[in-house]
Structure formats: structure tokens, C-alpha cells
Amino acid sequence: MKKSTKLLAGIVTLASAMTLAACQSTNDNTSVITMKGDTISVSDFYNETKNTEISQRAMLNLVVSRVFEDQYGKKVSKKRTEEAYNKSAEQYGASFSAALAQSGLTTDTYKRQIRSAMLVEYAVKEAAKKELTDADYKKAYESYTPEMTTQVTTLDNEETAKAVLGEVKAEGADFAAIAKEKTTAADKKVDYKFDSGDTKLPADVIKAASGLKEGDISEVVSVLDPATYQNKFYIVKVTKKAEKASDWKKYKKRLKEIVLAEKTQNIDFQNKVIAKALDKANVKIKDQAFANILAQYANTDKKASKANTSKSDQKSSSDSSKDSQSSKSKSEK
């Protein structure tokens, strides 16, 4: 479930948000529970739960969901939402229903969650495009490594990985054959092509390959598997490496993809985009119990304002210094 909702990492699932929404759309005096001598109304339940952390986050989630649906709903088709949902269901297979239940989700609430994430993702990506500069391209180019042809073996424990490393580094060793035999990868795949901005392998593995020369073999690269929370160990050999062109513009399209990916994954940038959307929607908190749910986005605005003020102060200070030096020079003359 994490893949589809990473842009909303600080917000809980829509399941709780729907509960709050139901409370708000039902008469406050409607009885939820009846018993001898007493009843529990919607109002009782709302007042009892609204100050809890889960309700605070649920309300935030509901606000963000509504705002982005209003501002960007036409940009993401329902078909795309369904496709993303079906893809997730396929990945989980027979355990999908259990995974939903464990996350406190239903089919409908999970689809809403996916859609909210996709709407935020769209907005963040569009905002990132508007901020692209030649400086961004040049910075990305500096650390960019063009396509590499590699052979990679994956091991489940460090001791075995070190033993395999000794084998593949032995004189005359056939790396590909050993890698194929020893790898614990489910598909037994060892041949890969990627550049430094690719994501088909863990970032640390790609980084290790990027630093190798053609024909070189890496040391053992340890990577924490986010799915199992267990370390996996990789050894990579670069068999072919494209020569890097001196003009960054040759890779402009690819560099754009890399820069946009970095920006859209940046939490501060995401928060800035969400803050702007909330400001445009003129969100007003009527119940003081929820007064602080947008604080993280208000802080984003303050940070940006503070940064701009700092830059302005630095410029003013620099200009004042120049004026002072100029006046001193004229006085000396």
C-alpha cells in the first residue's frame, strides 16, 4: 500500500476521514448506540474522538482530498485510478483482501486514497516543471552516468556474499555464470542495463555501479529491503559503459526526468505545493479542535518567506557594503 500513498505519508487513510465526514453529514442528535437509560449520539461520538491524533490526521486527509479533487480532479481520470488499483491488487495477489483489512481499508476507501495520492502527485509534478532551470539540468548532469551494461547477483546474507565476492574476483572467474548460480533473486536475472537515474535496482547498487570502470567488480553492497526489513547483499560488475558526452543538452530529456523525480519526492517541496493549494482554497477551520491540522503547511510558507527575507537581507547587506566601499574610495580620492 505504501507505493501508492507515499505523497500522503503524513496523512492517515481515508477510512477514518469518511467516519468524520459521516458524523458531520448526520444530525448531531442521531443515536449511534442505545442502551437502557442512555444513548450515544453522533455529537457525543464526535466530541469524544475529535481531539485524538487519528481524528486530527483524518480531518487533514479529508481536507487535502477535497481541495485537490476540486482543483485537479479533471487532470486525473477515473480510469487511471482504476488501473493503479488493479495493479496494486495484482501485486498482492490472493493476500490483497487481507492487506486491505490489515490497513483498515475497504475497496472504496483504498481507491479514494490512491486517487488523492495521484492528484497530489500531478500537482507536485506540474509545479516542479515550472521551476526547472538550466542550473538544475547542469547540476543533474554533474552526477549523471549514462547507460551501463552490468551483471548483478543478489544474496541473502553477508557471509555468503563475501564468499561469492571472493569467487567472482578470482583470476579467470566467469562472473556471469557464478552470479547466475548463486543469486537468490526470484527471477534469477543477472543482466541489467541502466543509467545513474534508474530505479530498477536499489539506489546504492546503481551508485556503486556508477563509480566503477568498465570491467570492474564492486564490493558487497548491503541494502535494506523495505518490503521485508531484511538486508540483501549485491555484487555488481560493469561490462560496458557508455562514454559521457561533454554537452549536458544531449541528455536533456533524461535529465529532466531525473530532476522532476527528485523534486516530486522532496517532502518540503510537496508540502509547499499542498500549502499553495490550501491557500487557494481559502480553507477556514471552524472547530478549534482542528485549529492546528494545517500547521505543517503554514510553517512551509513561513520557511519560504524567511528564506526570501534572508536572501533579501543578504542582498541589501551586500549592496550597502558596496555603497560604503564606493563612498570611502571617493573620499580618499
UniProtKB/Swiss-Prot annotation:
GO cellular component, one term: plasma membrane
Region forming the signal peptide: 1-22
Reaction it catalyzes: [protein]-peptidylproline (omega=180) = [protein]-peptidylproline (omega=0)
Keyword terms, alphabetized: Cell membrane, Isomerase, Lipoprotein, Membrane, Palmitate, Rotamase, Signal
Lipid anchor positions (S-diacylglycerol cysteine): 23
Gene Ontology biological process terms from the UniProt entry: protein folding
Residue ranges, annotated region (Disordered): 301-333
Record lipid sites (N-palmitoyl cysteine): 23
Keyword Signal: yes
Segments of skewed composition (Low complexity): 323-333
Bias kind Basic and acidic residues: ranges: 312-322
Domain PpiC, chain residue ranges per copy: 145-240
Molecular functions per Gene Ontology: peptidyl-prolyl cis-trans isomerase activity
InterPro entries: Foldase_PrsA (IPR023059), PPIase_dom_sf (IPR046357), PPIase_PpiC (IPR000297), PrsA_foldase (IPR050245), Trigger_fact/SurA_dom_sf (IPR027304)
Entries under Pfam families matching the protein: Rotamase_2
Main location: membrane
Protein localization: Cell membrane
EC id: 5.2.1.8
Function: Plays a major role in protein secretion by helping the post-translocational extracellular folding of several secreted proteins.
Family: Belongs to the PrsA family.
Protein name: Foldase protein PrsA
Organism of this sequence: Streptococcus equi subsp. equi (strain 4047)
